[in-house]
């Protein structure tokens, strides 16, 4: 697997080291392979403070690493016992957060074939889709990437190897607690499976591989549909020519590409229903993302905070935060807002729109209402309350997505400031 992952000399591998049989075996194997491949090896241990033995486990892991000449990174963390998803989920989140702080090229885990089968069954019982049923990948490229070299090996075989090699490891007493869902499957369900279906674990692990292939194909289909619909923003009518299933697949794929969590299927079903039901502008929350439509366009964006309620005074800063975005004040010549006008003003601040807001875009033309300006600029109604307005001594000098008022526009050759709203 190290060859398949193209692990190169001097790359940094970090083992997620609990001290149990699986991660102990993995650490010893990698320590043996280190001279051959030339990678740097370290280990990270997360002290969850959940067991009275946690301090002893940390000391054990430190001694193991010292004996193997492996750099050791301990993390002492606190786990919320009132986590809504349960103690297991809380500990897992804390563990992943700690491991994310390790500087390395690859995080290496001791997950094995039994873990893969348990993960698949656990997720299916929770109603997982194709992505969830794909369970764990042996190689996940990234920064850092993730490797699971033992994913095709049975738990019993790892134990047998560890015993034959006279390795020492710890036993976490919580792994025997049937109140944890995965432990219940491990100790009560899978033994019954094994009696009736001796090949159940390898078969379930193979099935997860089939789901992973299917998930990849769905991603390929979504990429084709993404391009066929005009990219982002999409052409709304072209998107809605697709079947409901393909629209949901495309939305789910794009949301994940944005780094957001994909919403439940029911939420996507309702979103597609609303998209087909009306041509009116829409803002449809989809978990941490939102589906937006205006006129003939449709796009996705992360859900963002609204505009600040209080004015944000500007005191010559190069940028001011605005909701989840930022307004930048970039020095230019002959464009943007005249710098002199701002320096002479008594009160300069970013504010949200206010009732009766008017702005004149060109000299000799009448003042126009905020609503009319937004309509002409193609700004949907749901976005308008979030637009930043630069107020200068009580007057609107600039509105995000619309532009500068004629009275404040910089003249040719004059020092100006170009305001850029980054959402």
From Swiss-Prot:
The answer to whether UniProt assigns keyword Transit peptide to this entry is: no
* CDD domains attached to this UniProt entry: TilS_N
Per UniProt, what is the name of the gene that codes for the protein in this document?
tilS
Q: Please provide one cellular component term from the Gene Ontology annotations of this protein.
A: cytoplasm
Reaction catalysed by this chain? cytidine(34) in tRNA(Ile2) + L-lysine + ATP = lysidine(34) in tRNA(Ile2) + AMP + diphosphate + H(+)
Q: Where does ATP bind?
A: 18-23
Q: Known InterPro entries for this protein?
A: Lysidine-tRNA-synth_C, Rossmann-like_a/b/a_fold, TilS/TtcA_N, tRNA_Ile_lys_synt, tRNA_Ile_lys_synt_N, tRNA_Ile_lys_synt_subst-bd
Q: Under the GO molecular function aspect, what terms does this record hold?
A: ATP binding; tRNA(Ile)-lysidine synthase activity
Pfam families according to UniProt: ATP_bind_3, TilS, TilS_C
Q: Name one GO biological process term.
A: tRNA modification
Disulfide connectivity? Answer: none
Q: What is this protein called?
A: tRNA(Ile)-lysidine synthase
Q: Where is this chain's protein located in or outside the cell?
A: Cytoplasm
Can you tell me which family this protein belongs to? Answer: Belongs to the tRNA(Ile)-lysidine synthase family.
| Function text | Ligates lysine onto the cytidine present at position 34 of the AUA codon-specific tRNA(Ile) that contains the anticodon CAU, in an ATP-dependent manner. Cytidine is converted to lysidine, thus changing the amino acid specificity of the tRNA from methionine to isoleucine.
Q: Which EC numbers characterise this protein's activity in its record?
A: 6.3.4.19
The entry's free-text remark on domains says: The N-terminal region contains the highly conserved SGGXDS motif, predicted to be a P-loop motif involved in ATP binding.
- Keyword terms, alphabetized: ATP-binding, Cytoplasm, Ligase, Nucleotide-binding, tRNA processing
The keyword Acetylation belongs to this UniProt entry's keyword annotation: no
Q: Which N-terminal residues, if any, form the signal peptide?
A: none
- This protein's species is Aromatoleum aromaticum (strain DSM 19018 / LMG 30748 / EbN1) (Azoarcus sp. (strain EbN1))
């Amino acid at each position: 697997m190290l060859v398949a992952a193209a692990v190169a000399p001097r790359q940094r591998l970090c083992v997620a080291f609990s001290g149990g049989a699986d991660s102990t075996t993995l650490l010893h194997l990698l320590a043996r392979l280190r001279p051959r491949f030339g990678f740097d090896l370290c280990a990270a241990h997360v002290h969850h403070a959940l067991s009275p033995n946690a301090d002893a486990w940390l000391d054990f892991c430190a001694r193991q690493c010292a004996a193997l000449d492996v750099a050791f990174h301990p993390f002492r963390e606190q786990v919320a016992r009132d986590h809504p998803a349960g103690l297991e989920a809380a500990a897992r989140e804390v563990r992943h957060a700690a491991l994310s702080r390790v500087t390395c090229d690859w995080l290496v885990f001791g997950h094995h074939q039994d873990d893969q089968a348990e993960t698949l069954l656990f997720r299916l019982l929770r109603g997982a889709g194709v992505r969830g049923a794909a369970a764990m990948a042996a190689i996940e490229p990234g920064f850092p990437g993730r490797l699971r070299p033992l994913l095709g090996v049975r738990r019993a075989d790892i134990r047998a190897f560890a015993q034959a090699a006279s390795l020492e490891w710890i036993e976490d007493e919580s792994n025997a607690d049937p109140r944890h869902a995965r432990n219940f499957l491990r100790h009560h369900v899978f033994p019954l499976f094994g009696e009736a279906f001796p090949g159940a674990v390898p078969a379930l692990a193979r099935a997860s591989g089939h789901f992973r292939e299917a998930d990849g194909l769905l991603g390929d289909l979504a990429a084709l549909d993404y391009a066929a619909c005009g990219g982002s923003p999409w052409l709304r009518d072209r998107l809605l020519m697709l079947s409901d299933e393909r629209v949901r697949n495309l939305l789910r794929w794009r949301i994940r590409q944005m780094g957001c969590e994909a919403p439940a299927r029911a939420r996507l079903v309702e979103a597609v229903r609303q998209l087909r039901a009306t041509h009116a502008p829409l803002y449809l929350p989809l978990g941490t993302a939102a589906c937006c439509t205006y006129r003939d366009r449709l796009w996705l964006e992360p859900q963002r905070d609204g505009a600040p309620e209080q004015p944000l005074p500007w005191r010559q800063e190069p940028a001011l935060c605005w909701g989840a975005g930022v307004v930048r004040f970039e020095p230019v010549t002959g464009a943007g807002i005249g710098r002199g006008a701002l320096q002479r003003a008594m009160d300069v601040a970013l504010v949200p729109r206010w009732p009766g807001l008017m702005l004149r875009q060109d000299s000799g033309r009448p003042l126009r209402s905020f609503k009319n300006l937004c309509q002409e600029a193609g700004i949907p109604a749901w976005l308008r309350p979030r637009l930043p307005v630069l107020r200068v001594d009580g007057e609107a000098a600039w509105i995000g997505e619309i532009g500068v008022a004629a009275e404040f526009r910089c003249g040719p050759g004059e020092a100006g400031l170009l305001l850029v709203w980054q959402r």
